Regions:
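Sec-dependent bacterial lipoprotein signal peptides
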Residues: 1-21
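Bacterial Sec-dependent N-terminal signal peptides
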Residues: 15-49, 197-202
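Intrinsic-disorder/low-complexity loop/linker signature
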Residues: 32-36, 43, 59, 67, ...
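Short, exposed beta-strand/loop patches in secreted or surface proteins that constitute
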Residues: 36-65, 158-166
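Edge beta-strand at a domain terminus
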Residues: 41, 97, 156-160, 174-202
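A mature extracytoplasmic/lumenal domain signature
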Residues: 52, 99-101, 166, 177-179
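Surface-exposed helix/loop patches within compact recognition domains
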Residues: 61-163
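Short, hydrophobic/aromatic-rich segments at coil-to-beta transitions
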Residues: 68-71, 167-174
Length: 202
């Protein structure tokens, strides 16, 4: 009887921990329930639709030690990459990010604000938000300092530089952001493209 109770209690605890670890940060402007087909985006836009919950252990629900950290983006027109097939209009891109790669960095040579939309050395900008659009197209991105999670930044604008490496579909890209408080940010990510078009697996 005691063993049965212990097993049931252990199962309950595991279930409760799973529920907690799957909790998501709230996205700006209505979040990921927005009807994509009803959203009119400017030509050349990449939409950062959502940053999903982090699954892992550690401080702050594992945000700084995430083992599975996904970034979901929505391409609104054909977008080229340096290597590999271009992203097509309407493609939904799912990246698995390397947890150690999420960095908030200072403006660097070769990275340009969205208003300039100039090419980036060794890469190319494939899209961006109109910074005047504001929070309806906002999303939360984790803010890392010295490899530690310090909070969520609400991103209301962004540009993206992306390049595909030759090995295993690993991508490196920068995201230029206009944060909720009006400050600018540059985020560097490394990750693996898992799905190029969600509709292809329906």
């Amino acid at each position: 009887m005691k063993k049965t109770f212990f097993y049931l209690f252990a199962i309950f605890c595991c279930f409760a921990m799973c529920l907690v670890s799957c909790e998501k940060p709230q996205t700006g402007g209505g979040g990921e329930d927005d009807e994509l087909e009803d959203v009119v985006l400017p030509e050349g836009t990449i939409r950062l639709q959502a940053l999903t919950s982090q699954y892992g252990s550690g401080p702050d629900m594992g945000y700084s030690n995430a083992s599975h950290n996904f970034l979901l983006m929505f391409a609104t027109e054909d977008c080229e990459v340096i290597e590999g097939e271009p992203f097509g209009n309407g493609d939904i891109l799912v990246f698995e990010l390397f947890s150690e790669s999420a960095e908030n960095i200072l403006p660097a040579e070769g990275i340009y604000p969205i208003k300039d939309m100039e090419p980036i050395e060794d890469g190319m900008i494939v899209g961006g938000f109109d910074v005047e659009m504001g929070t309806p197209f906002g999303s939360y991105i984790q803010h890392m300092e010295n490899d530690e999670f310090v909070g969520w930044d609400l991103v209301t604008g962004g540009a993206m530089e992306i390049k595909k490496t030759k090995k295993d579909g690993v991508l490196e890209f920068y995201i230029y952001t206009i944060n909720e408080d009006g400050t600018e940010g540059y985020y560097y990510y490394r990750g693996k493209l898992l799905i190029e078009n969600l509709s292809a697996i329906e």
